Amino acid sequence: MATELIENKLKLLPEKPGCYLMKDINGTVIYVGKSKNLKNRVRSYFKSKQVGRRAELVREIRDYDIITVSTDKEAFLLEITLIKKYQPYYNVQLKQGTGYPYIEITREHDPQTRLTSVVHKDGGYYFGPYPNVYAAQATLKFIRKVYPLRRCHGYQGRPCLYYHMGQCLGACFKKVPQKEYDEQIKKIKSFLNGDITSVKQDLTTKMEKASENLEFERAAEIRDQLKYIEETVEKQKIISNDNTQRDIFNYYVDKSWISIQIFFLRQAKLLRRETRMFPLTDAADPEDAFTSFIVQFYGQKNRILPKEILIPSGFDDDTLAEVLNVAVRTPQRGQKKSLLDMAKDNAKLKLDDKFRLLELGNRKTKGAQKEIFDALGLPYGHVIESFDHSHIQGADPVSALVVFKDGEPDKTSYRKYKLKGEVEHQNGGDEVRNTREVVRRRYGRLLREHKKMPDLILMDGGQIQVDACEDVLRNELNLNIPVAGMVKDDKHRTNHLLFGDPINGIPLKLIPLDPKSEGFYLMTRIQDEVHRFAITFHRRRHAKNALSSRLDSIKGIGPKSRNKLLRNFGSLKKIKEASIEDLRAAGLTLPQAQTVKLML
């Protein structure tokens, strides 16, 4: 079942490709997935019945995060990086060391091209990773045919088979000039970086010619070759071919708030990102706030500067670079510009989500509270107060007060009341006395201190509690505060509000709320909260009084000694576990400590 937080976030999902990170109650990433349409995919986890391992996953999800990208291919590549970074429990497809392949140009005297699953800091050139392993193999095969380097094991005194096939420059029997290697490597790098127009044109011409000559198998082979080249050499934004350590900053401003997105690229991978959002002061300029944030960001403890920082246009790169002592650049085109744009898109997405969540929150808070006031025919009020009583067969009676402001609990205003007299039985008369006492104490004090009264009082009960509350307010305190009762059905479920206006001759009547409405949800929340608060307070008081009673029965332990024990140990169990020395340290004499140990 989705939490309230998840339900709200599901309404904000974009219909874009990207990755989603499912988190458990501790905020740990337990699953990473990708989709062409984040809205449909993420919603499917919570809006349809799940079975097996997926059902187990959904039961653990307490929150999620998303990263949007431009294409499904980028989502696939980002998913690889995120899985390797977080090693989520429910991801079994990608383990450390068994990832997708890269195409490598080795850094050797006689270099070669090959597939590898591990990127080493050896000066070689790495391209990838490639999700389609077969396509990567086919592309490597094409490169070796069109841009040959070395295919053999090195010098052996005679030409190898690949040399005769035109797939080796001849390191097997001669010294190949470095210039020749450099020219080939330049072509391979250009090809793998996306410059494939001429190659595609050449292959397309050959495919058409083969088809005209009725060489259909040959034409199909070239067609597949084109497909594999497009799949592996397509430009990638998430996995860069540049291994420079790089941080990318961009921002988005709306409604006097700024959202700043930071991408951290390490070893050609987007390892993580951070989002910071904060309101702008009236005098703050967004550009100044952005640059100030960057400087403060790297001023934090344990924050390591990258080799390069990318920021959008409109800023003094040189000054920022001088302050940070690192290269600061503003790309105008190409892959870096695309990454910068992606950072801005994600900054906007995060800020839009924040505003939409606030709007949804207002519907669940202020909007819900308005529904309650509307149902009662009252003008909107900001403050609702609610009471509940608790006791066990009349022992240790207490009352509790909770306060909700604009639909949100204001816990600093909560109050606990120890009721003065004990009651003998739990009946209507007891409820009347408890209600009258706590209402008199609460609102009598507000009157004496000249404090603002609530806009509505909700009593956890029916006509008995409502009548008792209104009698004290109007006849003793001369206050006219609306009072309603939260009535439960025979299954102890909140059912209706009980409300009337005795002053104007309107009798009490049951007022229903739509069980699916936000107002009904808020009413049950208030009722559950005041009940919880009262029960918790009563349990603590009852336990303390029970302990006091047990201590009072011990000969030689008077009120002062009892209070010392209560203050130092708090519970009967801890007093029992205490040693003679511990009891003496709490202020008891040796005979008293020995008596306590003997009696307990």
UniProtKB/Swiss-Prot annotation:
Residues 15-92 form the GIY-YIG domain. GO terms for cellular component: cytoplasm; excinuclease repair complex. Residues 197-232 form the UVR domain. It is found in: Cytoplasm. One of its GO terms (molecular function) is DNA binding. One of its GO terms (biological process) is SOS response. PROSITE patterns: GIY_YIG, UVR, UVRC. It comes from the Bacteria. Keywords: Cytoplasm, DNA damage, DNA excision, DNA repair, Excision nuclease, SOS response. Gene3D superfamilies: 5' to 3' exonuclease, C-terminal subdomain, GIY-YIG endonuclease, UVR domain, UvrC, RNAse H endonuclease domain. It holds the Pfam family HHH_5. The keyword DNA repair applies. The UvrABC repair system catalyzes the recognition and processing of DNA lesions. UvrC both incises the 5' and 3' sides of the lesion. The N-terminal half is responsible for the 3' incision and the C-terminal half is responsible for the 5' incision. PANTHER family: UVRABC SYSTEM PROTEIN C, UVRC/OXIDOREDUCTASE. Interacts with UvrB in an incision complex. This is UvrABC system protein C. It comes from Lactobacillus acidophilus (strain ATCC 700396 / NCK56 / N2 / NCFM).
